[in-house]
């Protein structure tokens, strides 16, 4: 993320390990948003905790069920600039060995205005291993 930090403001981020089964990308968006599906029986996934206004107030790593990070997000101009600045600070401290870029968001939620947009559980699939890849292949072939 460091290499593209200048482009975060007013931009979508789509992780490279996801298959989008239905286009849920919207053009009329102005608040930072995690697109999230409710997934069951997940292992070591990042769960979004949010209030009645859909404002994300925490991210927990869980085993079980919940609305999880699905690999698609949008970042407003202000939030994108803040994330860029925090990424630069972390790089300067040279302490980023086991750091995901989403850790920057997680650790700065109090300073960000991030919402959740709920999507269907079959709208997106994360491909972490050959089993996931084969499952997505079956979905594509059977549609």
Say what each PLM segment does:
Residues 49-55, 110, 120:
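Short acidic-glycine loop/turn motifs at beta-strand connectors
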Residues 46-47, 55-57, 71-75:
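Conserved active-site beta-strand-loop modules that form the wall/rim of enzyme catalytic pockets
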Residues 42-44, 66-67, 121:
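Short acidic/glycine-enriched loop/turn segments that link adjacent beta-strands
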């Amino acid at each position: 993320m460091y290499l593209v930090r200048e482009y975060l403001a007013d931009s979508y981020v789509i992780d490279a390990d996801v298959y989008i089964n239905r286009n849920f990308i919207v053009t009329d968006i102005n608040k930072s948003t995690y697109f999230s599906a409710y997934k069951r029986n997940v292992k070591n996934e990042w769960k979004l905790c949010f209030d009645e206004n859909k404002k994300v107030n925490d991210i927990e790593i869980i085993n079980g069920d919940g609305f999880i990070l699905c690999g698609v997000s949008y970042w407003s101009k202000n939030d994108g600039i803040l994330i860029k600045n925090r990424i630069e600070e972390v790089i300067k401290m040279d302490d980023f060995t086991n750091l995901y870029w989403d850790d920057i968001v997680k650790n700065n939620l109090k300073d960000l205005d991030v919402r959740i947009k709920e999507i269907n559980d079959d709208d997106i699939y994360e491909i972490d291993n050959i089993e996931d890849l084969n499952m997505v292949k079956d979905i594509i072939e059977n549609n």
